[in-house]
């Protein structure tokens, strides 16, 4: 007859063994779930970031040498704009000048400085977020430059021949263009932006007979040469993917501004 002391309950080793394994499996599943959740969160963030820039044009991939050249060319333009502003203000302040000369000089000079300074900063800045902002500012300032260039010719040369209305039309278009750039955030096609610039630039054809009769022939020649240089420059703007073509575009734009500024300084103000 077995001893009562030997009637010990069986050890639960066999039943307890699966418990650590089950816990390990649960922990492994939890880690996998956390990893999947992390990947999903990162994917969601990436998708949200991508949706913010959906439809926006990517930043041009200029080389360092190109960006240095782009910054230098329009940095020179900003310096020339300051010089032009000073010369025009001094000339407009002389006795016997047209009443609108001083206002026209200030508007045109500031427009030159703003455009070339914005372009210089856009090409000089490296961080992409800031670069996108300055690209919008740069493109918006082109509208300001076009309207600012019109202002002396409209208020002084064509002042009594519908020039005020033309000046108002230009600045209204400039404001519309700036709002367009700000809200579209460059989702619009590149050709549409260029088309608006060219349409504003050549709007003067509606007052061309009056301008030809009132403006000095040399001033008219300088004005037309500047317009042609701007227009030819857009060809190189479209070819910006070719190395240093954007720099060539800058040179044409700068030359166009120089010719038209000379027309204003020498013959209008």
List the predicted regions and their residue ranges:
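Multi-pass alpha-helical transmembrane bundles in non-GPCR membrane proteins
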Residues: 2-269
């Amino acid at each position: 007859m077995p001893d009562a002391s030997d009637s010990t309950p069986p050890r639960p080793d066999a039943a307890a063994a699966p418990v650590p394994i089950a816990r390990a499996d649960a922990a492994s599943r939890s880690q996998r779930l956390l990893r999947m959740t992390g990947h999903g969160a990162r994917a969601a963030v990436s998708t949200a970031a991508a949706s913010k820039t959906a439809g926006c044009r990517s930043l041009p991939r200029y080389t360092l040498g190109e960006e240095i050249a782009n910054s230098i060319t329009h940095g020179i333009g900003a310096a020339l704009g300051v010089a032009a502003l000073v010369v025009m203000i001094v000339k407009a302040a002389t006795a016997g000048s047209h009443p609108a000369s001083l206002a026209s000089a200030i508007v045109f000079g500031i427009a030159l400085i703003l455009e070339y300074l914005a372009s210089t900063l856009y090409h000089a800045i490296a961080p992409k977020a800031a670069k996108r902002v300055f690209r919008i500012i740069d493109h918006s300032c082109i509208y300001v430059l076009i309207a600012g260039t019109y202002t002396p010719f409209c208020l002084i040369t064509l002042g009594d021949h519908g020039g005020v209305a033309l000046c108002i039309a230009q600045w209204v278009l400039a404001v519309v263009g700036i709002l367009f750039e700000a809200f579209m955030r460059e989702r619009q096609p590149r050709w549409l932006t260029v088309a608006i610039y060219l349409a504003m630039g050549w709007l003067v054809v509606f007052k061309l007979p009056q301008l030809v009769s009132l403006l000095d022939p040399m001033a008219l020649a300088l004005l037309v040469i500047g317009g042609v240089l701007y227009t030819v420059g857009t060809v190189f703007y479209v070819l910006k993917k070719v190395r240093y073509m954007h720099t060539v575009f800058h040179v044409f734009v700068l030359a166009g501004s120089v010719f038209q500024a000379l027309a204003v300084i020498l013959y209008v103000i």
